[in-house]
């Protein structure tokens, strides 16, 4: 007794993408003969196993046969025929479905990852509201800066795929300090969030945060916020530009 296991597909386009990957053909230049044969073989196998075939699979089979027959017709000299590839519509549908499938998989992965986290209601930090500037001579509560750091960290974690990235080089505090210094050369102050594009590794966000703390302690930068939950700005400190 033989057991035949068939992959489950979400429609004929899903099956076609599977076959394209299986026989390693270019989706932009599909050899219709090979693809149609593989597709019809799959339909034939389902018939042999007496599996009920959805009508959409049969409709796609007829479309493939029609495209294949058009490809076999002799070429004409009419200009409009030169730009009319019978496969174009099929290729467009396959690419659109491929993008949709990739995005769906991405969202499902994010959903699984989000389920690992627990949310809490925002903490009332109104009692921390202040117009003070954090500088070496005027130390204030670091809660707001830590909250801003956490926002960046969360956005980076959401946008960055969870892959293992092996790198020989690491991003150092010295490099982060240089980036902040270069940014202050162009602007007297800048928004803390402008340091990030939210696709960088989380380690880089942590390094920037530590560098800014160190630069503030040294008087190279000041950290300013008008009131709680406002944007945090990085300004030139009293020791900015002083050789060390």
Curated annotation (Swiss-Prot):
Subcellular localization(s) per the UniProt record: Cytoplasm
InterPro entries: ScpA, ScpA-like_C
Keyword Cell cycle: yes
GO biological process, any: chromosome segregation
Keyword Cell cycle among record annotations: yes
Record key words, sorted: Cell cycle, Cell division, Chromosome partition, Cytoplasm
Cellular component terms (Gene Ontology): cytoplasm
PANTHER family membership: SEGREGATION AND CONDENSATION PROTEIN A
HAMAP family: ScpA (MF_01805)
Family assignment from sequence similarity: Belongs to the ScpA family.
Description of how the protein assembles with itself and partners: Component of a cohesin-like complex composed of ScpA, ScpB and the Smc homodimer, in which ScpA and ScpB bind to the head domain of Smc. The presence of the three proteins is required for the association of the complex with DNA.
Function: Participates in chromosomal partition during cell division. May act via the formation of a condensin-like complex containing Smc and ScpB that pull DNA away from mid-cell into both cell halves.
Protein name: Segregation and condensation protein A
Native source species: Staphylococcus saprophyticus subsp. saprophyticus (strain ATCC 15305 / DSM 20229 / NCIMB 8711 / NCTC 7292 / S-41)
């Amino acid at each position: 007794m033989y057991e035949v296991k068939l992959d489950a597909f979400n429609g004929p386009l899903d099956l076609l993408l599977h076959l394209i990957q299986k026989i390693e053909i270019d989706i932009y230049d599909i050899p219709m003969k090979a693809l149609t044969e593989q597709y019809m073989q799959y339909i034939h196998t389902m018939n042999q196993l007496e599996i009920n075939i959805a009508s959409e699979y049969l409709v796609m089979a007829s479309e493939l046969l029609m495209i294949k027959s058009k490809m076999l017709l002799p070429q004409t000299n009419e200009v409009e025929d030169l730009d009319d590839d019978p496969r174009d519509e099929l290729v467009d549908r396959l690419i659109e479905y491929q993008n949709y499938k990739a995005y769906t998989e991405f969202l499902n992965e994010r959903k699984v990852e989000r389920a690992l986290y627990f949310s809490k209601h925002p903490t009332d930090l109104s009692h921390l509201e202040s117009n003070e500037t954090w500088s070496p001579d005027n130390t204030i509560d670091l809660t707001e800066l830590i909250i801003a750091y956490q926002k960046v960290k969360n956005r980076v974690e959401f946008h960055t795929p969870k892959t293992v990235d092996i790198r020989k080089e690491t991003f150092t505090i010295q490099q982060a300090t240089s980036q902040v210094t270069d940014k202050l050369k162009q602007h007297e102050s800048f928004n803390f969030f402008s340091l990030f594009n939210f696709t960088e590794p989380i380690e880089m966000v942590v390094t920037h945060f530590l560098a800014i703390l160190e630069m503030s302690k040294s008087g190279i930068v000041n950290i300013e916020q008008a009131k709680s939950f406002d944007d945090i700005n990085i300004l030139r400190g009293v020791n900015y530009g002083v050789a060390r």
